[in-house]
Amino acid sequence: MAKPSGKSTTKKKVKKTVVDGIAHIHASFNNTIVTITDRQGNTLSWATAGGSGFRGSRKSTPFAAQVAAERAGQAAQDYGLKNLDVEVKGPGPGRESAVRALNNIGYKVNNITDVTPIPHNGCRPPKKRRV
């Protein structure tokens, strides 16, 4: 028979407070992914244009990227985040609007870096489309 225990010993999960973070914006031609991490690279929050309710060609618009950045930024504010470094990757249409949205939420954007991978003549690119 089980013993009746006097007190449960479960701990409440405490959210860590992070002041400085990095916003990684991956803007492809079809979608925009915004991930907010701490300085070590541990993910605090993320959002995508597709996950924000946009489907099809509307997913690849600057407005969809703005909504995704706002959703990721609001979720990261629970950690006490104040300062952001922004790393933008890719040629998509949502690059500038996502950075602007993070700035409008109230984050202090320290610097914006373009980390788009550029090959030094590496792999052969796919052939051009003939429509």
From Swiss-Prot:
GO terms for cellular component: ribonucleoprotein complex; ribosome. The keyword Calcium does not apply. GO terms for biological process: translation. Disulfide bonds: none annotated. It comes from the Bacteria. It holds the Pfam family Ribosomal_S11. Part of the 30S ribosomal subunit. Interacts with proteins S7 and S18. Binds to IF-3. Belongs to the universal ribosomal protein uS11 family. This is Small ribosomal subunit protein uS11. It comes from Saccharophagus degradans (strain 2-40 / ATCC 43961 / DSM 17024).
